[in-house]
């Protein structure tokens, strides 16, 4: 980007600039080999249905240590390029004014143009290796590969093992049954692909499901002012008009395979769609400072958040084998938020600052994905999606804006203390703490697909005995990824050339997967997370310092669970880290 500079014109300031940025995200090599073990369970599978998932792999229930029985089931190679280029230009004009000694400020207006071009290109190659079309060319290219003892025509695992691999305590050794004592060798996997890549079939389905490109032209113009009424009141009103013009291209197909493992050719076409919208976004800020040690701030703002790019890509994916349709267009609206904030700050220059604030947000136009039956004469009538009437009775999945608003409200307390004015041991103490309490509410819209008896059915007639029905239901819960409690505290001490800090960060559990089923068996959330860190620093000279950092020294983990059973879904241990160096 380039700032063209500030220009003084008749007592006003004109600022202008232009910019360009480019981001390429490449995944040039993603090769996966899946080895399987036939019938490893030594217990009746039905008897394991109510066991916690992490106990099913116990040696009492499964035998998986005979490496000779493993065989190569499938091989997948993926590469991906996501590219985004942005051009921008902006212009601001600022003119100060002074009506009297007690009323002064400035007026400011301007605009910005931003053009975004983005595209996603994927490539997928795949082969089932337990079928003749897979293992025959492989053994022809690599005749010395070890065969599986399970079936002599299959490819075994032994030639792919990393002989230098040493297993550590998996997840702090809490789930001993999940420890893996062997791993695949990356070089062996790479060599396998280099030799046999012609045996991998190109999967067209992935390109149709994922690839897209698009262009967004965004214009914004604003006018605002800052008006000071003496030293005690500052009023900042303003408004911005935000206009977006979007055009996206993707692919549609009418005979798409039901998964990404088939290399069938099928007809597809380029699909284009466009949309535009504009919104007025006002903002009002008021600052009141009745005395030197109190600051009161009130604010009302309106903001927007645009939908995910992938949901804007125009696609009509018809999968006749499973009677399903996946549909999307560029007609989604951005999420709009009305924000109210109140902030009270109390100063004491010798000892610190205390702030208490409250906030309230009301958000509409959240985007969600609906899956429902395709039914004539309803909101999922085939003609509304330009799909064949023959798909009626099938299933369609498509994104849309929620008809319900979400709310978020909370209180935040912030305290910062220091005692440098004291003449005792407390002089070096530095303390800070932040507590945020939040409450959110969201209505999650869900369609229940069911079948009811057809009153017009007669044996031998043309009517079917049951009819598909869409029933709408709303589940109330928290906003996704929104904690109800955040707490951060830091305690430090400074003495001459030494400085030390110890800090703790706490986050309450959050909702990560909302309810879709009536029994709520799909709801997932995270456990509360606490992280401790420590930093030490010693100043050697005016230019050099010795420092040491200890991160997450209590080895806290990030845990995700299924609420109805409390069973873990995902557990991540980040471990602890220590750093020592010069600065």
Q: What is the predicted role of each segment?
A:
Residues 214-216, 275, 304-363, 382-418, ...:
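Outer-membrane beta-barrel signature, preferentially recognizing the C-terminal barrel domain
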Residues 42-73, 134-210, 374-401, 458-474:
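Flexible glycine-rich, low-complexity coil/linker segments exposed to the extracellular/periplasmic environment
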Residues 18-24, 81, 85-87, 95-97, ...:
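Transmembrane beta-strands of outer-membrane beta-barrel pores
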Residues 360-362, 379-514:
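Gram-negative outer-membrane beta-barrel transporters
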Residues 10-16, 105-111, 235-239, 282, ...:
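Transmembrane beta-strands of outer-membrane beta-barrel proteins
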Residues 20-40, 117-133, 203, 246-255, ...:
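Outer-membrane beta-barrel and related beta-rich outer-membrane complex signature
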Residues 4-13, 97-107, 122, 229-233, ...:
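Short loop/turn motifs that connect adjacent beta-strands in outer-membrane beta-barrel proteins
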Residues 131, 135, 364, 505-516, ...:
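C-terminal beta-signal and adjacent terminal beta-strands/loops
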